[in-house]
Amino acid sequence: VDNKAICLKLLAAESEAAVQAIIDSVPEMSDPANWDAIDERESNFNVVTNQASTGGKAATELMTNMVDAILMRRAFEQGIDPKDRSQAPPNMYKAVDRLIVNLRGGKLVNAEEAWLKDFASKNLIVGITGSRETTRKSKEWPCYTFVDNGEGQHPADFKNTFLSLSARNKSDIPFVQGKYNMGSSGVLSYCGARWFKLIISRRFDATGPWGWTLMRLRPGGGLPVADYFHLAGEIPAIDADALYPLHKNTGERFDGVMLKTGTVVKLYDFRVGEKFKSFRGAREAFNENLTETILPFRIMDFRWSPDKKRGGLRAHGIDARPFYGMEYALRRREDEREEDEDDDEEQAPAGATVAEKFEVGVIDDPTLGKIEITALPMRARADGKDPLPGWLKHTSSNSRVFHAVNGQVQYKQTRGYLSNCGFSGIKDRVAIIIDASQLDEGTHYKLWKGDRENILQNDTGERYLTIVKEIIVQSPSLDDWKQQIAREDLKRIATEDTNDLFQKLVDSDRELIALLDQRDPTLKLPDPKDDDEEFEGKFDPTFFTLGKRFESEPLELPLNKARAFTATTDAVNDFFIRADNQGRLFVSDEKVRARFAIKHILYDGHLTVFFSPADDTIQAGDFFEFELGLVSDSMSRPLTEPVSIKILAEEE
């Protein structure tokens, strides 16, 4: 059997039917003896299908694995043992700074556009080929090819990596995300009726050949089983100096993407979602499931007709776009006008002014770990059109609150949730990101369900959701944004003076009624802050002043309540959430950190720090004294004040 010829034919195939034709034409592939259950489990159906609930979510699992592969390769190349915590980066963001390029906190928003494009085009590509049908009625689906220039695998290692459902290969590696070892198989049930998925890989050091295998749903009736192809128990191997994994819609090889090592995964007739068949739709599906990609991607759609007038890739029928995730799309509008078929509506609409993200609050809980909550506001457009990008409009998505780990969305909450928190007026003017990346490792396993889309309804899940909601409800920054939007809406009512507009706005935000003067039918607008009064903080604070009541008396804290210290400071609003030289809350006594859940909110020079007992050994009458303040790596010393807490009996 000519392994190389078969592999290249499969790579060039652009439909499930074409793959089946290849199988039927090759005696070795038609022989059931050369197919075995993935992970040697005849019951692997339960694992394969009990993962992502949509094709878009499943695809982003693959993209996460691609980023892991790049970081792993760079670690190996620099002589770093990924499992040695004394030398390996402690998280993905620090891994980007140390192993790839210093982005001052590992954030893509700090990178130059030229570097982002160059890195993505050489390392992380998603190609869309095959069917050009984009209507919901069509039964045809495109193919997706995922190409990464990462660590790759030897053929002999496929069974313990790509073909494993249970081996925790990355569980001891602190700077990768794909620790569940299931993300690669989660796409199978979205690959047409036969679950065809091709994997080709070569180890990054080129010390061995390429290996390849094809996965499929076992033909015949009975319990569904996911199989993989082998030859006499061995993964087929081929020799090739370079691999060109993508083809133009004419069938010609595309020379613009080439691998000498790394991994290619091709999904045939991939069902990303009924409304996501178009190129824009694919990017929208990815955006909603990745708040950030950690490393830059390039997505290329090969299904266009060649347009010689436009030149570049469009002359070859290819539309290529950068993809960096939700946060980047909302904060920085990327333009590739020479390649656009239309406006980039998955990003902020043209004419929209997108504000920098702001802090909602930070939680440091000894039983859970650290949680950072930020908001991405969307300001009004000068032309009066909807400021929401298309993929966030409620006709496409109701999701507004995104719980993420290393950029990968684990759980979503809706517009209704924001209304329930008292923010109905901004439910279509903000996206909130709950960054749970710094939760304790044990918390992750107690919090997220195996599908990584839901939260377990146990003590950990209930505690997590409760403290997150408390921070959102208490957020002065969200309240200020709500007031700004209310002023905009009331101004529109007063200016346009139409009953229809008034009714529409009040229907969407019942809180507007409270802002109207009931004694006078004339609308009165709340006075905005004068420009001279706008708060301008400092990168590093120069003062931290405790509220006067705490200068001479302790914070009295019931065992079953949370109570807060208040302070004033000149720290800038993003002191705790910025990527570059992130500030920290200073607590002098580590025993206090270990025994109390601490939540803090900083906004316009006002800092509120909530303490609540989290240790069962704390008793009424206990007394704690320590220093509380602010610190960052660029400050010569922390700014602190002495504080004390007196524990009281539980309150009714």
In which residue ranges do the predicted regions lie?
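Charged, glycine/proline-rich intrinsically disordered loops and linkers
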Residues: R85-A120, L214-K248, Y324, A329-V354
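A short glycine-centered beta->alpha linker in the GHKL/HATPase_c
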Residues: G152-H154
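Acidic ATP/Mg2+-coordinating residue in the GHKL
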Residues: D148
